[in-house]
Curated annotation (Swiss-Prot):
EC number: 3.5.2.3
Family under the similarity heading: Belongs to the metallo-dependent hydrolases superfamily. DHOase family. Class II DHOase subfamily.
Phylogenetic lineage: Bacteria, Pseudomonadati, Pseudomonadota, Gammaproteobacteria, Enterobacterales
Residues involved in Zn(2+) 2 binding: 103, 140, 178
Taxonomic source organism: Yersinia pseudotuberculosis serotype IB (strain PB1/+)
Gene: pyrC
UniProt-recorded name of the protein: Dihydroorotase
Single GO MF descriptor: zinc ion binding
One annotated GO biological process: 'de novo' UMP biosynthetic process
UniProt: substrate binding residues: 19-21, 45, 140, 223, 255, 267
One annotated Gene Ontology cellular component of this protein: cytosol
Matches recorded under InterPro entries: Amidohydro-rel, DHOdimr, Dihydroorotase_CS, Metal_Hydrolase
Length: 348
């Protein structure tokens, strides 16, 4: 029997999907990311979405101002696609190095997506330009038709929206974000180098039974919602396969405690504090630690055409206890796996 490794050294990872929010929430949650991750793709769905070069630059400056001393962190900004976005604004932002990618939210699919796109074929000219200049398209892959069951919205999105986009724009780089189903995993595995996907720790570790059996656990509620066990197992198999089309994207999405624990709670899991130990635990369970570094630190840069990070992080087999809550002014944020212990810690 092979001895269990006691340390893991990997290239410093990047987070290819995160919500950093703004103001006090930003300054509270950012250090948990900037301490471990070198770069992060920052979602643009603020209450006032990031749709212009100027607003992206201003938001980037607010993020950089909140990075603690001693942390080396680069936020990678994204443009929020709307029905009326000017193609020149998108192109200018990408060519100036302000926008790394553009984000497609179907209108009302998730938090702060009311400004999202209601008629996707109408913005095909944006996709055509993005394909031409090599700008990645990041997609929240769920249909929003009220007649479609919430557990079926990702699978339906593939057939109705994603496949037509890929057929029309075959060389458009697309990230199918936070995938949650066997349908999505199989679709990405069957794809080509222009299609990638991010996978969150919560969708690898849990399924809908964990959220709903024996009481509702609101801190596991996110969108896309956790699916049945068969889908969870398919995601685990996909990341364990070593395919270079899957990479780390936490979708860490903090909300104040009272906004999660309510009669109509917000969707989002704040997993940044435990993200890397959580992924390591999953890969170890799957006997796939040999693929951890690629998933966390190599596949994403390769897809985006960016250099890998020079420095390394070290994970050590030391119990890591997640706090029950994290102060947020007069309130608090409940982290993913609150009060639980993971087998791996990031060496500081």
């Amino acid at each position: 029997m092979t001895a269990q490794p006691q340390t893991l050294k990997i290239r410093r990872p990047d987070d290819w999907h995160i919500h950093l929010r703004d103001d006090e929430m930003l300054s509270t949650v950012l250090p948990y990311t900037s301490e471990v991750f070198a770069r992060a793709i920052v979602m643009p769905n603020l209450a006032q979405p990031i749709t212009t070069v100027a607003s992206a630059i201003a938001y980037r400056e607010r993020i950089l101002a909140a990075v603690p001393a001693g942390h080396k962190f680069t936020p990678l900004m994204t443009c929020y696609l709307t029905n009326s976005l000017d193609v020149k604004e998108l192109t200018t932002g990408f060519e100036q190095g302000v926008f790394t990618a553009a984000k497609l939210y179907p209108a009302n699919a998730t938090t702060n997506s009311t400004h999202g796109v209601s008629d996707i074929p109408a913005i095909y000219p944006l996709f055509e330009q993005m394909q031409k200049i090599g700008m990645p398209l990041l997609i929240h892959g769920e249909v929003t038709d009220a007649a479609v069951d919430i557990f079926d919205r990702e699978a339906r999105f593939i057939d109705q929206i994603l496949e037509p986009i890929r057929q029309k724009f075959p060389e458009l780089k697309i990230v199918f974000e936070h995938i949650t189903t066997k349908d999505a995993a199989d679709y990405v595995l069957a794809g080509n180098r222009f299609l990638g996907a991010t996978v969150t720790p919560q969708h690898l570790m849990f399924n809908r039974n964990h959220m709903l059996v024996g009481g509702i656990r609101p801190h596991l509620f996110c969108l896309p919602i956790l699916k049945r066990s068969t889908h969870q197992q398919a995601l685990r198999a996909a990341v364990a396969s070593g395919s270079d089309r899957f990479f780390l994207g936490t979708d860490s999405a903090p909300h104040a405690k009272h906004r999660k624990e309510s009669s109509c709670g917000c969707a989002g899991v704040f997993n940044a504090p435990a993200a890397l130990p959580a992924y390591a635990s999953v890969f170890e369970e799957l006997n796939a630690l040999q693929h951890l570094e690629a998933f966390c630190a190599l596949n994403g840069p390769r897809f985006y055409g960016l250099p890998v990070n020079d420095d390394v992080v070290e994970l050590v087999r030391t119990p890591f206890l997640q706090p029950e809550e994290i102060p947020l002014g007069n309130e608090s944020v409940i982290p993913f796996l609150a009060g639980q212990t993971l087998n791996w810690s990031v060496k500081r």
